[in-house]
Amino acid sequence: MKTVVFAYHDMGCLGIEALLAAGYEISAIFTHTDNPGEKAFYGSVARLAAERGIPVYAPDDVNHPLWVERIAQLSPDVIFSFYYRHLICDEILQLAPAGAFNLHGSLLPKYRGRAPLNWVLVNGETETGVTLHRMVKRADAGAIVAQLRIAIAPDDIAITLHHKLCHAARQLLEQTLPAIKHGNILEIAQRENEATCFGRRTPDDSFLEWHKPASVLHNMVRAVADPWPGAFSYVGNQKFTVWSSRVHPHASKAQPGSVISVAPLLIACGDGALEIVTGQAGDGITMQGSQLAQTLGLVQGSRLNSQPACTARRRTRVLILGVNGFIGNHLTERLLREDHYEVYGLDIGSDAISRFLNHPHFHFVEGDISIHSEWIEYHVKKCDVVLPLVAIATPIEYTRNPLRVFELDFEENLRIIRYCVKYRKRIIFPSTSEVYGMCSDKYFDEDHSNLIVGPVNKPRWIYSVSKQLLDRVIWAYGEKEGLQFTLFRPFNWMGPRLDNLNAARIGSSRAITQLILNLVEGSPIKLIDGGKQKRCFTDIRDGIEALYRIIENAGNRCDGEIINIGNPENEASIEELGEMLLASFEKHPLRHHFPPFAGFRVVESSSYYGKGYQDVEHRKPSIRNAHRCLDWEPKIDMQETIDETLDFFLRTVDLTDKPS
């Protein structure tokens, strides 16, 4: 049976050996070049392939059409992936008649994604395992073919658990590969409601936060012990690494991070105490805890800290253009909740941000981005992160004022993008789910879905193509000029302060605000073309949390990424949205102040939006990039969002002239 293999690390080597032992013919192996910044304690797939006389390749992008064509020419019967670090495109997966299979180091559906070995230790799990599953477009989501459980011992660290996983993988492949070869396998679909997903870890994720319980910190030490980079802390500005530790149920009133004793080296934690058994000062040698204390100059009562003492860092300056808008004002609230951000904002109004105007770390100027170009350029230069949130994003305006949409959404934003290139500033740019247009994929994927729009004589697409072209310009600046960027694509975010009822009165608002206005005024709810179009509605709090994590950019994981931010579980048609909103309205304590419900009315899109309008039937995001880059998933149910949005708007209505 001919196979093409994608492999890396020890698991890649043992997977190749297992295939050869089972009688598979390996036509080619795809692997990675080693990262010089990574400690290579594992076997070399490239060396093994060379020794076995198998062609081996390490392309930067195996999903490039040229490589897809070359793999197709190999005519594989089956494809295997053993710890290959990149997603393999569906075009490649479909080349093998018997399918494609991946070896994953966890008990799927738990711990999908990156670094499951480390994450199970960080989280204090007592069991993990290996899973062989069928590969599909979504990472680690295909049906399970075989699974083997292993116990995690209390004294296991990353390397001992790695060896256990390798041993289990050999057993699993030895048992399963012959069955795949003969087409005799039983597949079990994964339970999506049990799935968890984790992103990759970086050394910066491993600093010891002493306010946490000692057991949590001990698990961190276990998870990143040598040959991983280790857990670390600081004494003043001196960094040191903890290689091994023990938990002590020490009852102490000492502040977390305080040295309780130096022999043994015992540190107070949020709960209990952590003994540092072995460690290393700076780039020195490994030594036992009491010697480390002496080297670092520690005495009883000394304080450790998670960051260098001199880096009580300057607040990150964030420039938000369009700060009074729906996303801008909620994001401002989230940033000011922390103590390390300074927010600079510009907008043509301030009603939504009035609650921040006296905040010492919020600086607002009322103005228009098309007029205040000098102010904007100065503040792009001054700030660290730029979010240009100004745009016309209401569908009726696409057909009513297409040129104004282009001028504001494209031309003005292009100028800001070029300022970011000029001053080498990080830009977080709001793309849109609209760029996917009439894409027919079940899930809209940032990296693989086609962006499909209608003909030129349908001006409703001017917003979509303006945003798409800016996405491409930003991407090109990233590739050619080193622009640090992240593109995020909101999928139907909803919540309080989404537009306002006055905007809805002139038709210039999003769907839920328009529907609320209909209920408030006792006018029929208009269902455009029957309201069967489906969307995935996302609570503003979920969306803002994802956007906040993009700004935080832990480990620079968001650089150069496109990230959908949406809730694929909250899918509903516009008609269903209207029905849910109506039910919430009828139960609201202020209901008696408003006129009777006037019913639903079906209208044609051309009569509502104008003749240049086209709609799309569905728009569901893949959120695998959000899982991978942000460790994020949406949590808030659509009904809760509807209830809170409705309540907010009803309480803004002047009830003095309403019936009681």
Curated annotation (Swiss-Prot):
Annotated NAD(+) binding sites: D347, D368, I369
Q: Which GO terms describe its biological process?
A: lipid A biosynthetic process; lipopolysaccharide biosynthetic process; response to antibiotic
Q: Name one Pfam family in it.
A: Formyl_trans_N
Which Gene3D superfamilies does this chain map to?
3.40.50.12230, NAD(P)-binding Rossmann-like Domain
Region Formyltransferase ArnAFT: start-end pairs: 1-304
Record-annotated site: Raises pKa of active site His: D140
Q: In which pathway does it act?
A: Nucleotide-sugar biosynthesis; UDP-4-deoxy-4-formamido-beta-L-arabinose biosynthesis; UDP-4-deoxy-4-formamido-beta-L-arabinose from UDP-alpha-D-glucuronate: step 1/3; Nucleotide-sugar biosynthesis; UDP-4-deoxy-4-formamido-beta-L-arabinose biosynthesis; UDP-4-deoxy-4-formamido-beta-L-arabinose from UDP-alpha-D-glucuronate: step 3/3; Bacterial outer membrane biogenesis; lipopolysaccharide biosynthesis
Q: Which GO terms describe its cellular component?
A: membrane
Give the binding site residues for (6R)-10-formyltetrahydrofolate: H86, L87, I88, R114, V136, K137, R138, A139, D140
Q: Name one GO molecular function term.
A: carboxy-lyase activity
**Could you tell me what reaction this enzyme catalyses?**
UDP-alpha-D-glucuronate + NAD(+) = UDP-beta-L-threo-pentopyranos-4-ulose + CO2 + NADH; UDP-4-amino-4-deoxy-beta-L-arabinose + (6R)-10-formyltetrahydrofolate = UDP-4-deoxy-4-formamido-beta-L-arabinose + (6S)-5,6,7,8-tetrahydrofolate + H(+)
- Which positions are annotated as binding UDP-alpha-D-glucuronate? 393, 398, 432-433, 460, 492, 526-535, 613
Look up the domain of life of the source. Bacteria
Site annotation (Transition state stabilizer) points to N102
Under CDD domains, the record lists: Arna_FMT_C, Arna_like_SDR_e, FMT_core_ArnA_N
- Family matches, as SUPFAM superfamilies: FMT C-terminal domain-like (SSF50486), Formyltransferase (SSF53328), NAD(P)-binding Rossmann-fold domains (SSF51735)
**Catalytic center residues:** H104, E434, R619
| Self-association state and partner proteins as the record states | Homohexamer, formed by a dimer of trimers.
Q: NCBIfam families of this UniProt entry?
A: PRK06988.1, PRK08125.1, PRK11908.1
The UniProt similarity line reads:
In the N-terminal section; belongs to the Fmt family. UDP-L-Ara4N formyltransferase subfamily. In the C-terminal section; belongs to the NAD(P)-dependent epimerase/dehydratase family. UDP-glucuronic acid decarboxylase subfamily.
Protein name, please? Bifunctional polymyxin resistance protein ArnA
Report the source organism. Escherichia coli O139:H28 (strain E24377A / ETEC)
